[in-house]
Amino acid sequence: MTFNGFAKRFVIRDAEGMYFVPVADVDRVEADGDYVAVIAGGRHHLVRQAMHVLESRLDPAEFVRVHRSHMVRIERIRRVEPCGHGEYELTRADGIRVTSSRSYREQVRRLLR
């Protein structure tokens, strides 16, 4: 299912079958080996898909990629602090901190405009 060309939900497969995770519930996305962890409501849902594929399915007005291994929901970012060398530390509403990489500094700087 898509909305404006972007995913509205993720289909998660596990040993018991399939279930859905609405994109509206997703807090962040992290690379996890050959999988991507879709984190929603404190639960990690593993998806066997490349990070760049998942990124293309998410609305860039709602999610920003800040590192090769991390994407975060923009509305849940509470603080951005420069760390030097083009890196930033982003603090989310739940207190979790994610450090951006230099490769994604422009994406973080756009958040600050």
Residue ranges and their predicted role:
Residues 107-108:
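Phosphate- and divalent-cation-binding pockets in alpha/beta enzyme and binding domains
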Residues 1-93, 97:
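Conserved binding/recognition cores within well-folded domains
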